[in-house]
Amino acid sequence: MTTSAQLFEQACRHIPGGVNSPVRAFKGMERAPVFVERAQGAYLYDVEGQRYIDYVGSWGPLITGHADPDVLGAVRSRLDDGLSFGTPTAIETRMAELICEIMPSIDMVRMVNSGTEATMSAIRLARGHTGRDKIVKFEGNYHGHSDSLLVKAGSGALTHGEPSSPGVPASLAEHTVTLPYNDLDAVRACFAELGDEIAGIIVEPVAGNMNCIPPQPDFLKGLREICDVHGSVLIFDEVMTGFRVALGGAQAHFGVTPDLTCLGKIVGGGMPVGAFGGTREIMEQLSPLGPIYQAGTLAGNPLAMAAGIALLEKIRQPGFHDALAERVATLCDGLEARAREAGVDLITQRAGGMFGVFFTAQQRVDNFAQATACNADTFRRFFLGMLEHGVYLAPSPFEAGFMSSAHTPDDIQATLDAAEQVLATLENA
């Protein structure tokens, strides 16, 4: 038994499923999860001392790689001053200014402790602002695990075959209308029937929790137009895409302006954090200015603010995101070429610094139904083979991959060399 397997067995005695987030359990992969000891740059090092080229990056935050010296230095510089105060600080104001500067759709922003808190708070704000109850979301889009949004969700809920969860009251779920992603006609039909009851639409502008599914042309623009006509709030969940698809997020990349934006991951530089922001008109309805309540004991934590500011300042340098997208293109084009040579049905999809690998004969994957129709068993064998060759991909066919600026051309070439060997074993899949 490996050390990781022993540690997993031990963890299962006191942690449900042995993990603190379900996708980490490697469920369906027929092996224990990798227990990581440390990480540096583009690499993970497990408890056995094995090194892996990492394309998970702590599920997205580590866009400059693990243990970035500038980010760690910023945290160290604050550490001796205290961990948390429960008071306003200058550093949280600097973070707010920086976010508003980078994302022009955000006039005001409030920090929270997770992406789930960000989306939950944005939904409450949209409902309070409009005086309506219903929220539209999309199949396979994951917006955290709050009750209102854990309906036909992606991410771990999709991997585990739980498109909704026991414990979510029907009285809450009935206010969530779930539609097919990338289907504007379905959205129009929904609003034709229920438009005066719909507080808002929440959407992943690039769906990253059913692998990586970019929006079809005009999908996001169409959502904006529908919300404008019906007086509903358009919420972009940019927890994953914010500062990664482009510096200004997917909204900058696709040229569509939401009313509210949810952020997380990169904004904390690897520390637990989230944020939501938007127009002054809507955000000023939050307590203590307005009647809509939201709070958090550790929100705006100074260490998280220091880490996030250091990272944002680093990635806003000219050319950073272009170089990241070039790395992704090299990897994805190389994977497709090697799959063709091996006779394996494989396509990739990408958006900025994120990408997806689909084992399918389809030319494109646009929605939940098409994502779940891909060959999950072939993915499982590919994942395990790549792991044996020292490449760490997301342990689920429904999670996006993430590139960092720490990945070198040699890392990408080593990944493609490993893929060539593994794909050769899948030829008759």
Curated annotation (Swiss-Prot):
Q: Tell me which species this is from.
A: Chromohalobacter salexigens (strain ATCC BAA-138 / DSM 3043 / CIP 106854 / NCIMB 13768 / 1H11)
Cellular compartment(s): Cytoplasm
User: What UniProt keywords are attached to this protein's entry?
Assistant: Cytoplasm, Isomerase, Porphyrin biosynthesis, Pyridoxal phosphate
Assembly, per entry: Homodimer.
This protein's name: Glutamate-1-semialdehyde 2,1-aminomutase
Q: Per its UniProt record, what PROSITE patterns does this chain match?
A: AA_TRANSFER_CLASS_3
Gene responsible for this protein: hemL
Q: Which InterPro entries match?
A: 4pyrrol_synth_GluAld_NH2Trfase, Aminotrans_3, Aminotrans_3_PPA_site, PyrdxlP-dep_Trfase, PyrdxlP-dep_Trfase_major, PyrdxlP-dep_Trfase_small
EC class, as a word, reads isomerase
